[in-house]
Regions:
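ALDH superfamily catalytic-core signature
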Residues: 222, 230-374, 437
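Residues at or immediately preceding the N-termini of alpha-helices
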Residues: 27, 41-44, 63, 264, ...
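Conserved C-terminal structural/oligomerization subdomain of aldehyde/semialdehyde dehydrogenase
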Residues: 27-35, 220, 257, 338, ...
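N-terminal Rossmann-like NAD(P)+-binding subdomain of aldehyde/semialdehyde dehydrogenases
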Residues: 1-132, 326
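Rossmann-like NAD(P) dinucleotide-binding subdomain of oxidoreductase/dehydrogenase enzymes
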Residues: 123-266, 394
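Structural signal for hydrophobic packing residues in well-ordered secondary-structure cores
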Residues: 55, 59, 74-81, 85, ...
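Residue-level signal for inorganic ion chemistry
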Residues: 30, 66, 88, 111, ...
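Short, well-ordered beta-strand elements within core beta-sheets of diverse protein domains
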Residues: 33-39, 54-60, 107, 146, ...
Length: 480
């Protein structure tokens, strides 16, 4: 049993003041493999105090100095990336190859993007070109509370920590208690990078405890949260009494619009695989596939075949399979939503309830495809967070756009078409923060975030840094 009960506060690993033991389970075996502490009020207060005391000095460092610390952190991260990949794979079930390339790789990519953003960031400038004595200045916003999820641990931790460090903020990180071990390892990397004591602090805990204290504490200036929309609403309410800056990256129910002027086999195969990737545990997963009616029957066959050919296996095995869901609670939720799809009359063409054949332990699920879904079905409305694809036809471009936008979410949307003109026209009408056309990837440092109940603010690159900055105007200083 791995023992990681201590918290990282003010540059040291310290024993909990009021922590309670919490077992971390391996989702592939359902067995505990590590123990952490869930911090309490005293632990959280200690971390906030350390960050508050250090802010006055850290916020006065130059961007060049902060860049050197980020470079040192990147070096430590790269040197220990094998450890990180194994840690993520064990705690949340990502297959080891995917954990190395995508999960661990995301953290490295974000650190590099923040370094590029720092090189080009304009920290002060005239309000208008050539206007003397009227200056705009960007300054660190203060002490940041960073609350991260379990599904993409380092993607989210580095998006928040890297941006806050670049901006000159100090911080308290609360990772998900379900998958905390990668964040413990990350804290070790921060220590190796030599950041001043108190700049980065980490306290494990649950949302109701540490999360609520951080969100409502008067010495926290910024809250950056990634998780469910329900939890994001609660955090916003908790932060309101002290009027904090709140950045939220929340749920999604992203549409994938497939027009008949594209390569249907390639587009549907790609879309289904993206839906199933990370066992469907991605907020931007393309879980609603809307297909032009003339191509619908072919698309359903392709999606069903893709699901049936998607292998499910242990996370510690090499290959391009998918692993288990992260927890029993997540498994039960996904099973219930698959059953809801069946009960409400959607046609199941692949997968279904229960574990895959030959697997009787671990929170593994069958890649599942529903055809003939309708807009009001639960599987078309609720974020499932499992490898479950819902498909339905459309007749016109206008109908496709209307169906795509018929959701309280607006994180991402996907377009498959052979026409650039159509792609631009449709993209302009989709109410989502990120649009990807014909499988195009997103450039490193692109802004990540969405419309409506998918959140507030953006992460990544220069936009992520700006979430941790205040803008100050200074009038009346002339000359150098």
């Amino acid at each position: 049993m791995i023992d990681k009960r201590n918290f990282y506060i003010n540059g040291s690993w310290v024993a909990p003041i009021s922590g309670a033991d919490f077992l971390v389970l391996n989702p592939a075996t359902e067995e505990p493999y590590a123990v952490i502490s869930l911090g309490g009020k005293d632990d959280t207060e200690a971390a906030i105090k350390a960050a508050r005391v250090t802010f006055s000095s850290w916020s006065m460092t130059t961007p060049q100095e902060r860049a050197e610390y980020l470079k040192a952190l990147l070096a430590s991260y790269e040197a220990r990336s094998d450890e990180m990949a194994k840690s993520i794979s064990t705690e949340m079930g990502a297959p080891i190859d995917m954990s190395m390339t995508d999960q661990t790789g995301a953290g490295k990519s974000h650190l590099k993007a923040f370094l590029r953003a720092l090189d080009n960031f304009e920290w002060s400038k005239p309000i208008r070109p050539g206007m003397e004595g009227q200056e705009l200045v960007h300054e660190a916003a203060g002490v940041a509370a960073l609350i991260t999820p379990w599904n993409w641990p380092m993607n989210q931790v580095v998006l928040k920590v890297g941006a806050a460090l670049a901006a000159g903020c100090t911080m308290v990180l609360k990772p998900s208690e379900i998958a905390p071990m990668s964040s413990v390892l990350f804290a070790e990397m921060v220590h190796e990078a030599g950041l001043p004591a108190g700049v980065f602090n980490m306290v494990n805990g649950d949302g109701a405890g540490v999360g609520t204290i951080l969100s409502s504490h008067p010495d926290i200036d910024v809250v950056s949260f990634t998780g469910s929309t329900r939890a994001g609403i609660l955090i916003s309410k908790a932060a309101a009494d002290t009027v904090k800056t709140v950045s939220l990256e929340l749920g999604g129910k992203s549409p994938n619009l497939v027009f008949d002027d594209t390569d249907i086999d390639a587009a549907v195969t790609r879309g289904a695989r993206f839906c199933f990737a990370n066992t469907g545990q991605s907020c931007n997963a393309a879980t609603r596939m809307l297909i032009e009616r003339s191509a619908y029957d072919e698309a359903v066959k392709v999606a069903a075949a893709t699901a049936k050919s998607t292998r499910v296996d242990m996370p510690n095995k090499h290959g391009d399979h998918i692993g288990p869901l992260v927890s029993e609670a997540q498994f039960d939720k996904v099973q219930a939503l698959i059953q809801a799809g069946i009960d409400e009359g959607a046609r199941i063409v692949a997968g279904g309830v229960g574990r895959p054949e030959g697997i009787n332990r671990g929170w593994f699920v069958k890649p599942t495809v529903f055809a003939d879904a309708t807009p009001n079905m639960t599987i078309m409305r609720e974020e499932i967070f499992g490898p479950v694809l819902a498909m339905m036809p459309f007749d016109t471009e206008e109908e496709a756009i209307e169906l795509a936008n018929d959701t309280p979410y607006g994180l991402a949307a996907y377009i498959q078409t052979g026409s650039n003109e159509r792609a631009r026209r449709v993209a302009a009408k989709l109410r989502a923060g990120m649009i990807q056309v014909n499988g195009s990837g997103r450039a490193a440092g692109s802004p990540f975030g969405g419309y409506k109940q998918s959140g507030v603010g953006r992460e990544g690159g220069v936009w992520g840094i700006e979430e941790f900055l205040e803008i100050k105007s200074i009038s009346g200083i002339f000359g150098d």
